[in-house]
UniProtKB/Swiss-Prot annotation:
It holds the Pfam family PGM_PMM_III. This is Phosphoglucosamine mutase. GO terms for cellular component: cytosol. Activated by phosphorylation. The active site is at S97 (phosphoserine intermediate). Mg(2+) binds at S97, D236, D238, D240.
Amino acid sequence: MQSIFGTDGIRGRFNEEITYSLAYKVGYALGSTLEKEKPILIGRDTRISGDILLQAITRGLNESGKKFINLGICPTPAIPYLIKQENLSSGIMISASHNPPEYNGIKIFDHSGQKITKHFENKIQKLIEELNQNISVPRKVIPLNKNKDLMDIYIKSLIQTMGGENLSGLKIILDTCHGSATTCAKKIFQYLGADVKVINNSKNGLKINMNCGSTNLEPLKKALIESPAHMGFSFDGDADRVIGIDSKGNVLDGDHILFLWGRELMEQKILTNNLLISTQMANLGFEKAWEKIGGILYRTDVGDKYVRDAIKEKRAVLGGEQSGHILSKINNFSGDGILTALQICKYCKKKNINLNDWLKSSFEPFPQKLTNINLDFNINKLNPKTKILIDQTIENFQAIYSDNCRVYIRPSGTEPVMRVLVEAKNHDKVNSLSSEITKKLFSEINKIIN
């Protein structure tokens, strides 16, 4: 059996890769592994399939003898925060993050609120393989009570990160993308005194991430034109990432957030070794600008768990991804889109600067193009020999083009696509090289497969 775990837990299309039977087995395997006294915390995003998977996981936990607490619809970062705060045994988030509504996934956190290790994934996988019978969906759905008190604890913790700073005088637009941020983002910003407008704010799981959210900024840009505001923030489906937009429509992505936040910490002399952790997707313009002011950028493979591992190894205090996952010491290095947005607002207020001017003081990104090559298969589930051939082909492409620009190619850990990133000093070069590389790479991969 191929590993069910990808770069960010288990993920796939509901009723294909992610089924009721698999979710039950995950619950049973996890419940059988953990100590019985402390309960496990479970949350989900707004996807329609989330309730079915929740039923399956809790059934598995029950039959393994493990107690659980149902948080209901919540941001992913609420799970790791509350695990540590309430001394729980583990946590599960049912979400496919930024993926479309037909996808879902299962993220598992350990007793310290960190995503489980590869070793623990293998342990769960082995137990699941031993449960070889297919588990059918029961006719009767059992209602599950939600714990609202724990959600209030999480919300209060976010407010406390402001250190008494309020957001009065700031007009802010939030795109909650019909996802987890609908539960609390508006409430938090309003409590802090901001004038808040929210778009895509229904808990409609059929619309989650559809033409909205952190992977599609057009609705937020349009809203900022129609209702001028100081800034806007766009979250993904489970609210663990965020992208900002200033009053003039300029994008504040994860690279900009890391640069600006990192510079503040550097000036306060609390940024260890002036080090930031990011990934291979980080813009070259960001890296050069950061080095120019005396900083060091350490790159990891793509995925917030790799960023977190490097933060721990290098004893860094801040890291993240261009996509808007920002991991800071404030929240035990768990990506939290709402917390990140609050910190941006806090710095703007404390410095008495608008986001547009603050963004201008960061860096000019190199032209960058990310292209997805759609495949008929998940490259991570191929046999080892075929995967090695494809990996060698990728390395060859990166070596050939390294003199002209920066090329980074990787298979997605969650979807059947190959991602090709090309950076150069001008747009024409980026576009021509991207087109050339994707065509050749697609051809080479097909030769290997066929």
